[in-house]
Amino acid sequence: MIEILENKNNETDKNLKSITLKNSNEKIAEIKIANTFFSRLMGLMFKKNGKVQVLFEIPEKINKKERSSIHSFFMRFEIVLVFIDKSNAVYEISELKPWNYYVPKKPAKYIVEFDRREFNDCLKIGDEIEIK
Protein backbone atom coordinates (compact mmCIF):
# COMPACT_ATOMS: atom_id res chain seq x y z
CA MET A 1 0.00 0.00 0.00
CA ILE A 2 1.34 3.41 -1.00
CA GLU A 3 0.16 6.42 1.04
CA ILE A 4 -0.22 10.03 0.02
CA LEU A 5 0.03 12.37 2.99
CA GLU A 6 -0.93 16.05 2.86
CA ASN A 7 1.89 18.39 3.89
CA LYS A 8 1.07 21.20 6.29
CA ASN A 9 3.46 23.77 4.83
CA ASN A 10 4.27 23.96 1.17
CA GLU A 11 7.78 25.19 0.46
CA THR A 12 7.98 23.99 -3.15
CA ASP A 13 5.37 26.19 -4.82
CA LYS A 14 3.22 28.78 -3.10
CA ASN A 15 0.33 28.21 -5.52
CA LEU A 16 0.10 24.42 -5.40
CA LYS A 17 -0.71 22.14 -2.48
CA SER A 18 2.13 19.77 -1.65
CA ILE A 19 1.83 16.12 -0.62
CA THR A 20 4.26 13.32 0.21
CA LEU A 21 4.09 9.93 -1.48
CA LYS A 22 5.38 7.19 0.83
CA ASN A 23 5.28 3.47 1.34
CA SER A 24 5.22 1.87 4.78
CA ASN A 25 8.87 2.64 5.52
CA GLU A 26 10.11 5.58 3.50
CA LYS A 27 9.28 8.74 1.61
CA ILE A 28 9.08 8.08 -2.13
CA ALA A 29 8.57 11.58 -3.48
CA GLU A 30 7.47 15.13 -2.79
CA ILE A 31 4.51 15.83 -5.07
CA LYS A 32 2.61 18.96 -6.10
CA ILE A 33 -1.10 18.61 -6.85
CA ALA A 34 -2.25 20.03 -10.18
CA ASN A 35 -6.01 20.42 -9.77
CA THR A 36 -6.75 23.55 -11.81
CA PHE A 37 -6.77 23.98 -15.58
CA PHE A 38 -3.58 26.08 -15.54
CA SER A 39 -1.65 23.82 -13.15
CA ARG A 40 -2.61 20.74 -15.24
CA LEU A 41 -1.58 22.59 -18.40
CA MET A 42 1.86 23.49 -16.98
CA GLY A 43 2.86 20.28 -15.17
CA LEU A 44 6.65 20.06 -15.38
CA MET A 45 6.93 22.25 -18.51
CA PHE A 46 9.79 24.76 -18.50
CA LYS A 47 11.33 23.20 -15.37
CA LYS A 48 15.10 22.64 -15.39
CA ASN A 49 14.74 19.49 -13.31
CA GLY A 50 11.94 17.48 -11.81
CA LYS A 51 12.98 17.41 -8.16
CA VAL A 52 9.32 17.90 -7.29
CA GLN A 53 6.87 15.64 -9.12
CA VAL A 54 3.29 16.51 -10.14
CA LEU A 55 0.04 14.66 -9.40
CA PHE A 56 -2.75 15.53 -11.83
CA GLU A 57 -6.30 15.19 -10.53
CA ILE A 58 -8.35 14.48 -13.65
CA PRO A 59 -11.87 15.93 -13.47
CA GLU A 60 -14.59 13.34 -14.01
CA LYS A 61 -16.08 15.30 -16.93
CA ILE A 62 -12.74 15.10 -18.76
CA ASN A 63 -12.44 11.41 -17.97
CA LYS A 64 -15.74 10.65 -19.67
CA LYS A 65 -14.84 12.49 -22.88
CA GLU A 66 -11.10 12.04 -23.27
CA ARG A 67 -8.40 9.63 -22.21
CA SER A 68 -6.25 11.72 -19.91
CA SER A 69 -3.59 12.36 -22.56
CA ILE A 70 -0.25 13.91 -21.62
CA HIS A 71 2.26 15.83 -23.72
CA SER A 72 5.89 16.67 -23.05
CA PHE A 73 6.12 19.83 -25.16
CA PHE A 74 8.59 22.38 -23.76
CA MET A 75 10.04 19.70 -21.45
CA ARG A 76 13.79 19.63 -20.86
CA PHE A 77 14.00 16.04 -19.61
CA GLU A 78 12.35 12.64 -20.00
CA ILE A 79 9.40 11.89 -17.75
CA VAL A 80 7.73 8.78 -16.36
CA LEU A 81 3.94 8.81 -16.34
CA VAL A 82 2.12 6.78 -13.69
CA PHE A 83 -1.60 6.29 -14.38
CA ILE A 84 -3.94 5.56 -11.46
CA ASP A 85 -7.53 4.39 -12.01
CA LYS A 86 -10.74 5.12 -10.10
CA SER A 87 -10.02 2.24 -7.69
CA ASN A 88 -6.72 4.03 -6.81
CA ALA A 89 -4.54 1.32 -8.37
CA VAL A 90 -1.58 1.93 -10.68
CA TYR A 91 -2.60 0.44 -14.03
CA GLU A 92 -0.01 1.81 -16.45
CA ILE A 93 3.51 3.28 -16.37
CA SER A 94 5.08 4.85 -19.44
CA GLU A 95 8.21 6.85 -20.29
CA LEU A 96 7.95 9.93 -22.46
CA LYS A 97 10.76 11.87 -24.13
CA PRO A 98 10.55 15.65 -24.60
CA TRP A 99 8.27 16.90 -27.39
CA ASN A 100 6.06 13.82 -27.48
CA TYR A 101 2.46 12.92 -26.71
CA TYR A 102 0.95 9.93 -24.92
CA VAL A 103 -2.58 8.56 -24.62
CA PRO A 104 -3.12 5.90 -21.92
CA LYS A 105 -5.07 2.68 -22.51
CA LYS A 106 -7.99 3.87 -20.39
CA PRO A 107 -9.05 7.03 -18.53
CA ALA A 108 -7.14 7.88 -15.36
CA LYS A 109 -8.34 9.35 -12.08
CA TYR A 110 -4.82 10.54 -11.29
CA ILE A 111 -1.60 10.83 -13.26
CA VAL A 112 1.77 11.31 -11.57
CA GLU A 113 4.47 12.95 -13.68
CA PHE A 114 8.02 12.08 -12.54
CA ASP A 115 11.39 13.24 -13.82
CA ARG A 116 12.76 9.92 -15.14
CA ARG A 117 16.01 10.47 -13.19
CA GLU A 118 14.01 10.69 -9.94
CA PHE A 119 11.57 7.80 -10.53
CA ASN A 120 13.75 4.80 -9.50
CA ASP A 121 10.87 2.33 -10.07
CA CYS A 122 9.22 3.61 -6.88
CA LEU A 123 5.75 2.59 -8.14
CA LYS A 124 4.73 -0.61 -9.90
CA ILE A 125 1.64 -1.70 -11.82
CA GLY A 126 -0.87 -3.01 -9.30
CA ASP A 127 0.29 -0.76 -6.43
CA GLU A 128 -2.67 0.67 -4.54
CA ILE A 129 -2.61 4.34 -3.59
CA GLU A 130 -4.24 5.56 -0.37
CA ILE A 131 -4.87 9.28 0.05
CA LYS A 132 -4.93 10.42 3.70
Residue ranges and their predicted role:
Residues 2-132:
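Compact, glycine-rich, soluble single-domain proteins
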